[in-house]
From Swiss-Prot:
Underlying gene: Khdc3
Regions annotated as coiled coil: none
Region annotation (Disordered) ranges: 132-201
Mutant lacking the gene: phenotype: Reduced fecundity and impaired preimplantation embryo development with a high incidence of aneuploidy due to abnormal spindle assembly, chromosomal misalignment and spindle assembly checkpoint inactivation. Loss of cytoplasmic lattices and aberrant organelle distribution in oocytes. Increase in abnormal embryonic structure and loss of the embryo following compromised post-implantation embryo development. Knockout mice show normal brain structure and weight. Increased DNA double-strand breaks in hippocampus neural stem cells at P1 to 1 year of age.
GO cellular component terms listed in the entry, alphabetical order: apical cortex; cell cortex; centrosome; chromosome; cytoplasmic lattice; mitochondrion; nucleus; ooplasm
Subcellular locations according to the entry: Cytoplasm; Cytoplasm, Cell cortex; Nucleus; Mitochondrion
UniProt-recorded name of the protein: KH domain-containing protein 3
Amino acid sequence: MASLKRFQTLVPLDHKQGTLFEIIGEPKLPKWFHVECLEDPKRLYVEPRLLEIMFGKDGEHIPHLESMLHTLIHVNVWGPERRAEIWIFGPPPFRRDVDRMLTDLAHYCRMKLMEIEALEAGVERRRMAAHKAATQPAPVKVREAAPRPASVKVPETATQPAPVKVREAAPQPAPVQEVREAAPQQASVQEEVREAATEQAPVQEVREAATEQAPVQEVSEAATEQAPVQEVNEAATEQASVQAVREAATRPAPGKVRKAATQPAPVQVCQEATQLAPVKVREAATQPASGKVREAATQLAPVKVRKAATQLAPVKVHEAATQPAPGKVSDAATQSASVQVREAATQLSPVEATDTSQLAQVKADEAFAQHTSGEAHQVANGQSPIEVCETATGQHSLDVSRALSQKCPEVFEWETQSCLDGSYVIVQPPRDAWESFIIL
């Protein structure tokens, strides 16, 4: 079987069969070669790819090795899949040494080939990695970085904040309509309050509003006709019960004076700064009382005049505050009108009178109680000083004073003095009555 490839050698040989070889042609044999060396050669099997590494291309290094080692080296390649066969001819000790040397050389070349292959593979991998890095990573990263921020973040910032904020900002000014609607409502409420302030109070509120005009017919009938004791008691107690009158007597004013002293009246805040009590005292100071108030002021009121003489007249608060009443000078100096809260804030209220003045009033009540009936005395003591003042100037004081003056005219004769315009009346008790109070 012929070899696929022949390598260079000093002595060309042809394999006959078994271990029989013959020299081809008539070559020049080296001096160290003997024909007996062709028997029983040494064989070595290696990979065909190692032959070129071991002996060079086409075995160009084999003649040099043969001359140096004094052995013949014959290489036969039977196929690329099969192993190459190396025959070693020479003396037996040389054959063993050359066989060991070629085995080590084959191992070294094998390792060298593996390193070369590994280096080539590494270079190839790096080349492929560099090629991939140059071709694939750039477009992949650009595609991932470009579409994601553009398609995800930009649409959210472009579409979501704009409609949400605009839609929320659009309906927010809607409460302005409510404010505009509330403004005319507040104006209508103020107009109603103004109308309510200008309208006249009903007849039932005559006791509190001394400025309103009462029917002339009732005043004339009350001034001409004599009322029995029961009607007098009912008229005196008609305003409130005895317990309510006693509670009202301990309070400075029928309303909440403390709140009225610090807060404006609920009718008109602007007008409250210039007006007095909610009853319109200024108009009452200039206008005459209802009906026949002037005549009633000049008539005798033996039951309740003793308290009215000691307190300030509710009609003229400014003038009465400076002029003491002849009946009770000490009490009039210490007490103030409960109707006008702001001007009388520095003066003492009727409730804060001294114990001495209260004791004198109680004794005076007991002295007058001997001349009047028990019921009239109880009614006079049950009412508060504010109600006595209102009763002395209002329409009900006409009935009470008229009835009591007709029933017991022999008690005392009082002296009255009225101003030119008839806006207020000064009632002076006689000297005898004043001395009787001092004795008590």
